[in-house]
Each structure stands twice: as structure tokens, then as C-alpha cells.
Amino acid sequence: MQETFSDPLPIDACPIRLSSWMGGDRDGNPNVTHEVTSAVLLDSRKRAAKLFLEDIEVLVKELSMADCTDEFREYINDFEVQEPYRELMKRLRSQLKKTIIYLDGKIEKRLPESSDDILIHNDQLWEPLYACYKSLVECNMSIIANDRLLDTLRRIKCFGLT
């Protein structure tokens, strides 16, 4: 888009928002019950969490640099860690794994593990990654910020976790 229109797309722009009506055909189809709709929604959330987990796994490996803004150190609340971006990605990885386990429990109709520290809203994934992005840009690492991390931020806006 940037090559065509010359201006970069704002980072939080969402020119396309994808969604699905799977499990929502409840206008007379007797096979689409509340349970079917609920199961489809849970399965979709789990799939989204798995896809974002794949992104975070790559970012854990890629974001090993130490230079970051003071604001980012405050955000992660750790002034001693040597690889602050990696530390944040590890936290997100843990939250995504807990989210997947929780959703598995809901799908299998058993009491899920604790719902503590799971990702429910898109902003729970967007905000930490955007803080990471801003810090990288401010520390003259725009090339890194505008690669996989920017792709992930755009996917959050386009697809989300829910």
C-alpha cells in the first residue's frame, strides 16, 4: 500500500476487518444450536491464540537487543533485565499458552485451568506489542520494528483474538 499511495498506513489502521458467521446460521437451521455457536466461537478464539503464539515465538528469537526507552522499562516493570523485548515476549508467550489451555478446557466441557493471566481482549495483546514497537522506533530500530512486529500488530487489528 505504501508503494502505491506513498504515505505509510497508520500503525493502528484496519482497512479490512475479517470476521466469520460460522456457527451463526441460527435463523431456522435446527442443527445450529447455542452449543454449536459457543463451540465454534471457542474454537476460533483458540485458533487465533495459536496463530499469535506462533508470531510471539518468532519475536522471542528476533528481539534480543538490550537498548530500549526508559518508558518501556517502566512498562515491563523490570530495570535489570538484559533483553527487555525478549522478556516481554516471554510473558506474552506464557499468557497465550495459558489462554489456549483455558480454551481447551472450555471446549472439552471440563473445568478449565484458572482464568488468571489469560488474554481475553485484543488490547491485552496490542498494548504490550505497541509499547515494544514504540520503544524500538525511538531507539532507532525502525527496520526491526517494521518487520514481524508490525505484521503482528496489523493482524491484531484485522483479526483479533476474539
Map each language-model feature to its residues.
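Short, hydrophobic/amphipathic alpha-helical packing segments
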Residues: 2, 53-56, 133
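Extended, charge-enriched "interface" segments that sit outside catalytic cores
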Residues: 63-162
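Extended active-site and interfacial segments that coordinate phosphate-rich ligands
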Residues: 32-58
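Conserved phosphate/anionic-ligand binding catalytic regions in large, soluble enzymes, centered on
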Residues: 16-36, 152-162
